[in-house]
Structure formats: structure tokens, C-alpha cells
Amino acid sequence: MVALPLQAARAGGDNAHMLDADPSSRVAVVGGGPAGLIAAERLRAAGLAVDLYEAKGSVGRKFLIAGKGGLNLTHSDPRPLFASRYRERAADVGRWLERFDADALRDWARGLGVDTFVGSSGRVFPLDRKAAPLLRGWVRRLRAQGVAIHVHHRWTGWDADGAACFDTPEGPRRIRPAASRREMGGWPHG
């Protein structure tokens, strides 16, 4: 990720009117899967103006596919036990869980209008065991917070001048955000 020039990219204040007109004052998140959605959410919560770009016609498509299996969100194990399951990375995972543990995730889902339950295995699921209501709530909240979502924008790299390049139905598009994150996980296998 490019270092964020916060004074240029912060939303609000006297320059709030400039954020929509000047893409160089915004942060671009490329990828509309869970990693991209959470990045957009966290950047927006930090006061930054955010544009999220997704190659497909909607965000969270693989998330919806994962939800067909009941959408195991997390596990209810106590933090030390949960972290220990990651063996050599247990210390790192333990630190992450200090900031956002299973209870925080359940609260986050509840904030999107989705209640959860702990199954007999200790796994945490949405009450209706579906991904779509969670995704709809998440996208609705991001839009309400001012995140601009651009679908059918396939990132192709940077041009010689350093602009981010996208293929869109309207043709090539170049942008120069203040900073960018590429959250294009979930590479297809096979």
C-alpha cells in the first residue's frame, strides 16, 4: 500500500466538497471481496474518502458462494485456544484477536442486521445460515458511509505516469488516487 497522505485524503472539514470532484484526494481499494470491503470500511472509519473498484458486476460474489455451506464466520473458542490453532503464527493471531475477536465479529454482524449463533461445534454462523443478508447489509452500510462502489472496473495495472488503469464497459479509465490498496484475493484454482 502507498503511504496515505492523510491531510489530502481525509473526508470532512472545509474541503469535503472537493472529495467528489478530485480523485487525487481519495483512496482506491481494488477488489470487492471481503478483504476489499473490510479495507474500505476501515479506511472510511478513519475518515478517508474511499472508492472501491470491482471487476465483476457486483461485490462479494465468492463470499456468496462460500455462504452456500452455511457461512462459518468464526469460532467461539477462547482467544488463547483459538490462536493456538495457528501454531507458529499463534502470537500474531493472538495480537489480531486482541483487536477483533469472535465477539467483535458477532457484534459487527449484528450491526449489519444479522444475528448469529454458536453451533454445537463451537463455530459461529448467521442465524439464517445465509451470506446474502450479511453482504447486503455490509454494502448498504458502506454506501451510507460514503464509499463509492464502482463495478465492471477490471484493474489492469499502472500506466507510465503512475495512474491506475481499469478496463470498463465504457472503455479504459485512468485514475490518480491519493493512495491505493489491492485486495484481489481468492485467485481461482483449477
Please provide the spans of the model-predicted regions.
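N-terminal Rossmann-like FAD-binding beta1-loop-alpha1 element of flavoenzymes
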Residues: S25-L52
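Predominantly flavin-linked oxidoreductase catalytic cores and closely associated redox partners
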Residues: P133, R140-G190
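Short beta-strand to alpha-helix junction loop
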Residues: V93-D101, S121-R140, G185-G190
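Glycine-rich FAD pyrophosphate-binding loop
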Residues: R44-K68
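Extreme N-terminal leader/targeting segments of oxidoreductases
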Residues: L6-V27, A45-A46
